[in-house]
Amino acid sequence: MTIPVPKPAHPAAPDTNTDGLPNPKVVVPVEADEEEDDDDEEGKEDADGAVPAASHFSTHALDGTKKKKKKKKKPKKKKTGEAGAGGQSEPPRVPVSKLFPNGNYPSGEESAYLGENSYRTTSSEKRELERLAAQEDPESAENYNSIRRAAEVHRQVRRYVQQTVKPGMSMTEIAEMVEDGTRALVEVDGLQRGIGFPTGVSLNHCAAHYTPNAGDTIVLSADDVLKVDFGVQIGGRIVDSAFTMTFNNKYDKLLEAVRAATNTGIREAGIDARLSDIGASIQETMESYEVEVDGKVHKVKSIRNLTGHNILPYHIHGGKSVPIVANSDESAIMEEGDHFAVETFGSTGRGYVMDDGECSHYAKNPDVNKPIRLARAKTLLNTINKHFDTLPFCKRYLDRLGESRYYAALDNLVNLGIVQAYPPLSDIQGCMTAQYEHTIILRPTCKEVVSRGDDY
């Protein structure tokens, strides 16, 4: 989930595996085997009537008897929702805790720090402090098992999505495919485990913050560019990762540009790194690409008023922004222990987004405490506090909880500033936008791209 750059008081514009390290292991479904064929197939001769040559050298052949031919095992066809032996089902419904019964989940891509922080990689003191902190408090920020579990859920859900989503599916089908898989694999448990924020399925010129509301009729087409942005949280530790899907090769260079820009941001990230320098490097990579569409060449532009962000427990936007263009602020830096969502957006349009269309994304503002006079707004806020607290939510999630006739109450909470609305963000009509995003942890000893997979 992205964060738009705050609008200036007087805006000039309209309103507003590069380190060579292995990817984490991912559990792959293993097909169960069929039982051996019936006895009447045993000892069957070859087509020309001869016994298979290998049997002439068997112990059975020495006494003149014919060796029974070893039967080929036929793969058992897996039924919908059935797990392979030791693997994930299709659709994914096997909790990752069942696939990793020892409770140790794969780490992400780990990279050594460079420059003056390179000592951290080999520092026995840093390693010991990291180890002790994780042992002393399983819920501490230094214990990475919860977020690695969330990352494994993300990888397994998105693998199925990438294999299954096809033109002709509705946006609601796609969003619910992601969410149903996430709930099952994470073993949803109130605020302790569940969805990190509404599933973004933004299309084409819409870059972010679109998820279908009830009654949405939009259907995916073969020429669409689909951004899938979803989160998984365990104990408030959120994995935020996104990818882009297309169904022809027309926009391959756009996706390549954005993927490369995100990896540049990850490469440049580190303890004491200036956020402005990271933004400049991202922009340089992004805008070195061009896309030819129907004979017209488009320069890929970074969407300058969208950024990445740090992540705090139960807060998807922690207060620090990772720009994707150069800026003059040299004071903001990354620090040891930070969790960041490094995300970039590229566009064939003007590289600037504005609010566009019906809102679906919302989040409670923890810093606002105002009296509420509307009784229905009070009961709605109670629901929000109980089920989401400061985690983002959408109207479909309220519908799922049985809330009804709440639109006026929700508007009241937004007008009071108690709830923040996050409407869809779009570039100009007719252009295409793409997104890639990973969650990284700046550990004391190394940088870990916790959401890295074998796909991106």
Swiss-Prot record:
Primary localisation category: cytoplasm
Origin superkingdom: Eukaryota
Named cofactor requirement(s): Co(2+); Zn(2+); Mn(2+); Fe(2+)
Biased composition (Basic residues): 66-79
Compositional bias ranges of the Acidic residues kind: 31-45
Pfam families: Peptidase_M24
Compartment(s) where it occurs, according to its Swiss-Prot or TrEMBL record: Cytoplasm
InterPro entries with a match to the protein in the record: Creatinase/aminopeptidase-like (IPR036005), Met_Aminopeptidase_Type2 (IPR050247), Pept_M24 (IPR000994), Pept_M24_MAP (IPR001714), Pept_M24A_MAP2 (IPR002468), WH-like_DNA-bd_sf (IPR036388), WH_DNA-bd_sf (IPR036390)
Record's compositionally biased regions (Pro residues): 1-11
GO cellular component: cytoplasm
Enzyme Commission number: 3.4.11.18
Annotated binding of a divalent metal cation 1, by residue: D229, D240, E437
Reaction catalysis annotation: Release of N-terminal amino acids, preferentially methionine, from peptides and arylamides
Keyword Repeat carried by entry: no
Annotated positions binding a divalent metal cation 2: D240, H309, E343, E437
Cofactor note: Binds 2 divalent metal cations per subunit. Has a high-affinity and a low affinity metal-binding site. The true nature of the physiological cofactor is under debate. The enzyme is active with cobalt, zinc, manganese or divalent iron ions. Most likely, methionine aminopeptidases function as mononuclear Fe(2+)-metalloproteases under physiological conditions, and the catalytically relevant metal-binding site has been assigned to the histidine-containing high-affinity site.
Chain's role: Cotranslationally removes the N-terminal methionine from nascent proteins. The N-terminal methionine is often cleaved when the second residue in the primary sequence is small and uncharged (Met-Ala-, Cys, Gly, Pro, Ser, Thr, or Val).
Family under the similarity heading: Belongs to the peptidase M24A family. Methionine aminopeptidase eukaryotic type 2 subfamily.
Protein known as: Methionine aminopeptidase 2
